[in-house]
């Protein structure tokens, strides 16, 4: 115990919660602190940008219910249509007088709920402790603009920058704005950039930059299709990245068929260019297609060769082991090496997965 001049102890540095679980639904219905002076998550609800009712956790400060989840380290703020370059940030998270936010903060509810889903995936599936694997909080800022892109209030983007998520918005024609915090795939994509930044830190140029983008696309699509089924059946997956966000209303990219968005799906079509840091958003589609192949390849019985949760873990372990200038071939070798280690002790399964990886990449010309 710390206090009255005593030194720190492990109880000061490690969060200890206990909880009660509903025996019928298996849902956590009540959290409580297992140590003194620890913030306890409070159950809340609210309407999000998609007009859906969402359940999430926050905390109570005085008479206010804040979008700060102390258990998952997810915090959500309103930037009030200010420039993301301004040094002054909101002093307090989005709050409400009741635990039911209703439709009073739809952008904030979407950001908070979706960041929680991504956080849960990182923690439960990848076994990663936050973005930096050291418990970094996921801080989201809604209602942002970037003055270098125009005076606003429209800012058609969402970005991981300065260790935070910044969400723009677009006018929907009825005097209101649709926040980019509604797009789970975009959020997962951007937060994966945070993992890349704090692990392999792939150089954002040429093939290493294309890998940087591809890993974000891979996890964006997997996480977007993970909930609520954890994962949902593969037959119903949406393989598009940013559906509806491209000019003309189409997707930004499509992992299942990159040619739908005019992008390459094979090394024969690799785009040699100095534009976009060596075509990072274009050539990433070749590696995206390889990942799609691996996610969907089946055995003779018509079953998935590698379940999506295992594919996600293999790619995560690969990402954290790459060097900064890694190219597509380096990634393939690292992925096979990770699979060897992961399936060590089961040689037949090891060989089966290695063959699946080799075939998935060979089909797009990566060797």
Residue ranges: model-predicted function:
Residues 1-187, 194-367:
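Zymogen propeptides/activation segments of proteases
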């Amino acid at each position: 115990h710390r206090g009255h001049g005593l030194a720190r102890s492990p109880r000061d540095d490690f969060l200890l919660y206990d909880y009660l679980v509903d025996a019928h639904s298996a849902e956590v219905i009540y959290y409580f602190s297992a140590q003194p002076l620890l913030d306890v998550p409070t159950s809340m609800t609210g309407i999000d940008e998609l007009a859906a009712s969402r359940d999430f956790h926050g905390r109570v400060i005085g008479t206010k219910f804040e979008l700060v989840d102390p258990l998952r380290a997810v915090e959500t703020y309103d930037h009030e249509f200010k420039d993301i370059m301004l040094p002054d940030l909101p002093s307090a998270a989005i709050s409400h007088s009741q635990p039911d936010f209703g439709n009073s903060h739809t952008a904030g509810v979407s950001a908070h709920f979706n960041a929680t889903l991504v956080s849960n995936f990182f923690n439960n599936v990848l076994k990663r402790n936050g973005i930096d694997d050291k418990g970094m909080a996921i801080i989201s800022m809604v209602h942002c603009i970037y003055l270098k892109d125009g005076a606003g209030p429209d800012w058609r983007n969402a970005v991981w920058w300065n260790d935070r998520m910044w969400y723009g918005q677009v006018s929907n024609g009825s005097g209101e704005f649709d926040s980019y915090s509604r797009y789970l795939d975009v959020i997962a994509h951007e937060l994966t950039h945070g993992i890349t930044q704090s692990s392999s830190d792939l150089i954002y140029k040429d093939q290493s930059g294309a890998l940087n983008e591809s890993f974000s696309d891979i996890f964006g699509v997997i996480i977007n299709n993970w909930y609520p089924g954890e994962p949902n059946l593969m037959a119903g997956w949406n393989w598009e990245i940013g559906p509806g966000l491209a000019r003309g209303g189409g997707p930004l990219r499509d992992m299942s068929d990159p040619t739908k968005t005019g992008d390459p799906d094979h090394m024969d079509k690799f785009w040699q260019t100095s534009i976009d840091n060596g075509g990072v958003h274009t050539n990433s589609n070749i590696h995206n297609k390889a990942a799609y192949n691996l996610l969907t390849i089946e055995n003779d019985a018509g079953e998935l060769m590698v379940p999506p949760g295992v594919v996600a873990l293999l790619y995560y372990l690969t990402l954290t082991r790459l060097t900064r200038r890694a190219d597509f071939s380096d990634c393939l070798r690292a992925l096979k090496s990770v699979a060897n280690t992961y399936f060590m002790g089961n040689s037949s399964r090891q060989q089966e997965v290695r063959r699946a990886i080799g075939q998935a990449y060979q089909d797009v010309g990566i060797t």
